[in-house]
């Protein structure tokens, strides 16, 4: 097995296979559930809008893969600073049956100098998730924060407020996951001494098996080989799956773009 093939197999089991499109339907989400149960193994999770969770739960159960987790998004995609709305959306997502919630950090407030609202928003969403045994991922939107000091600060605030994962991006802005932002964020996890309890999720722009290999190499280098398991590392992606399957001998290499 080549290094690329091994990385492709590993990456497949770390995917949050995602559809977050305005034209999503129950049928499209059910098709996503089928894709998540691939010929080379199943993904860690799917990531969908909250209203589709019941249809996804039923589809995953009926196809015999109830262990594929269901992630959803809240305060998405704009990362507004209204804590009550973010909390209400998070509670609603939990009520729909989410296993994991990816909440958008109020990154514009941080850029404007307000660190407190982000801490409080994540803290309150974490309390709701903790009570329901739901994993909380915090999207800091690195492509909008841009500056290394802001990316580090948002990561630190999210972790201090209780994030189970820190995630790069919504996939809805011009610049999404990059290796540079990934290095900054995983270095914060290492430097804060929270590698046992906090994970990392690059999202948006991870499209090929080669891309996945580079992120996994980075994780191995910063946090140690073996750290990047499904409890500590996820890829938020859609088009990546076809590239991984092609690398593993299942189908042709895809063309075009995708999340």
From Swiss-Prot:
PANTHER family: DEOXYRIBOSE-PHOSPHATE ALDOLASE (PTHR10889:SF3). Keywords: Cytoplasm, Lyase, Schiff base. One of its GO terms (biological process) is 2-deoxyribose 1-phosphate catabolic process. GO terms for cellular component: cytoplasm. It is found in: Cytoplasm. The gene is deoC. InterPro entries: Aldolase_TIM (IPR013785), DeoC (IPR011343), DeoC/FbaB/LacD_aldolase (IPR002915), DeoC_typeII (IPR023649). It catalyses: 2-deoxy-D-ribose 5-phosphate = D-glyceraldehyde 3-phosphate + acetaldehyde. The active site is at residues 102, 167, 201. This is Deoxyribose-phosphate aldolase. SUPFAM superfamilies: Aldolase. Pfam families: DeoC. Belongs to the DeoC/FbaB aldolase family. DeoC type 2 subfamily. Its EC number is 4.1.2.4. GO terms for molecular function: deoxyribose-phosphate aldolase activity. It is an enzyme of class 4 (lyase). Catalyzes a reversible aldol reaction between acetaldehyde and D-glyceraldehyde 3-phosphate to generate 2-deoxy-D-ribose 5-phosphate. Pathway: Carbohydrate degradation; 2-deoxy-D-ribose 1-phosphate degradation; D-glyceraldehyde 3-phosphate and acetaldehyde from 2-deoxy-alpha-D-ribose 1-phosphate: step 2/2.
């Amino acid at each position: 097995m080549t290094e690329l093939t091994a990385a492709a197999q590993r990456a497949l089991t770390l995917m949050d296979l995602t559809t977050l499109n305005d034209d999503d339907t129950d049928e499209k989400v059910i098709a996503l559930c089928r894709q998540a149960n691939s010929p080379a193994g199943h993904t860690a999770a799917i990531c969908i809008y909250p209203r589709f969770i019941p249809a996804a739960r039923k589809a995953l159960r009926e196809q015999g893969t109830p262990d594929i987790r269901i992630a959803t998004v809240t305060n998405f995609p704009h990362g507004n600073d209204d804590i009550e709305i973010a909390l209400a959306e998070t509670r609603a997502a939990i009520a729909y049956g989410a296993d994991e919630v990816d909440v958008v950090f109020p990154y514009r407030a941080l850029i404007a100098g307000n660190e407190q609202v982000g801490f409080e928003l994540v803290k309150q969403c974490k309390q709701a998730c903790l009570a329901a045994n739901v994993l909380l991922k915090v999207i800091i939107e690195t492509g909008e924060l841009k500056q290394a000091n802001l990316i580090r600060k948002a990561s630190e605030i999210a972790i201090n407020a209780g994030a189970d994962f820190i995630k790069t991006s919504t996939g809805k802005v011009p610049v999404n996951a990059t290796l540079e932002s990934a290095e900054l964020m995983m270095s914060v996890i290492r430097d804060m001494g929270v590698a046992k309890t906090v994970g990392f999720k690059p999202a948006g722009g991870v499209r090929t098996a080669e891309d996945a290999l580079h992120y996994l190499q980075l994780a191995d280098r910063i946090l140690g080989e073996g750290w990047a398991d499904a409890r500590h590392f996820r890829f938020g992606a859609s088009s990546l799956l076809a590239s991984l399957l092609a690398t593993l001998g299942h189908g042709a290499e895809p063309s075009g773009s995708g999340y």
